[in-house]
Amino acid sequence: MTIHAAVIQKLLNTGAHLGRRAAEHHFKQYAYGTRNGMTIIDSDKTLICLRSAAHFVANLAHMRGNIFFVNTNPLFDEIIELTSRRIQGDSYNHNRAMNLWKMGGFLTNSYSPKKFRSRHKKLCFGPTTMPDCVVVFDSERKSSVILEASKLQIPVVAIVDPNVPLEFFEKITYPVPARDSVKFVYLFCNVITKCFVAEQMKLGIKEGSNEDLMKDLAA
């Protein structure tokens, strides 16, 4: 089995190719076909888009940029928290990274979060400094964040489902077409982490080796 075939098989094992509904017209470029009213996503297209997103993340690490993760699905909390800890290290803030996004102004209000937190202690009102990239999970529900990031010209990396509306899809800089299963989100976060941390090691920002990184991610 070739490396490409092995990677595609790994994607198939995550269920990334199983779209939940019929695809919107703009998504059909990523669709292999349909079955029982559900879109079958082309795994080759998913892999191409995942590589593009990973390359961007590596360049971001080289420029010493920062990433902010946006998630509302509790099934992904543990995965994304672990990813955030590995990428952000000592600067990781559990409350900022893991709390739910429930109202507008996530990015545009990022410079004045304190006046809200006294009344809404369980909410997350965004980073205290502008991120260089926003990674969005459950992009259909996080359309307001995508619009804000686009307005502020912040690149967006997002896992996209076949029914994401065109107005939001067009504003995602690096769309990764896939079903957001727990297995795929874990794979996606692993790829992001490997690329970002490996580049940090090259720059001497993080100590360790690629071998250490691989062992850590496999644990």
UniProtKB/Swiss-Prot annotation:
<comment type="subunit">
    <text>Component of the mitochondrial ribosome small subunit.</text>
</comment>
<keyword id="KW-0496">Mitochondrion</keyword>
<protein>
    <recommendedName>
        <fullName>Small ribosomal subunit protein uS2m</fullName>
    </recommendedName>
</protein>
<dbReference type="InterPro" id="IPR018130">
    <property type="entry name" value="Ribosomal_uS2_CS"/>
</dbReference>
<dbReference type="InterPro" id="IPR005706">
    <property type="entry name" value="Ribosomal_uS2_bac/mit/plastid"/>
</dbReference>
<keyword id="KW-0687">Ribonucleoprotein</keyword>
<dbReference type="InterPro" id="IPR001865">
    <property type="entry name" value="Ribosomal_uS2"/>
</dbReference>
<dbReference type="GO" id="GO:0005763">
    <property type="term" value="C:mitochondrial small ribosomal subunit"/>
</dbReference>
<dbReference type="GO" id="GO:0006412">
    <property type="term" value="P:translation"/>
</dbReference>
<dbReference type="Pfam" id="PF00318">
    <property type="entry name" value="Ribosomal_S2"/>
</dbReference>
<dbReference type="GO" id="GO:0003735">
    <property type="term" value="F:structural constituent of ribosome"/>
</dbReference>
<dbReference type="InterPro" id="IPR023591">
    <property type="entry name" value="Ribosomal_uS2_flav_dom_sf"/>
</dbReference>
<keyword id="KW-0689">Ribosomal protein</keyword>
<comment type="similarity">
    <text>Belongs to the universal ribosomal protein uS2 family.</text>
</comment>
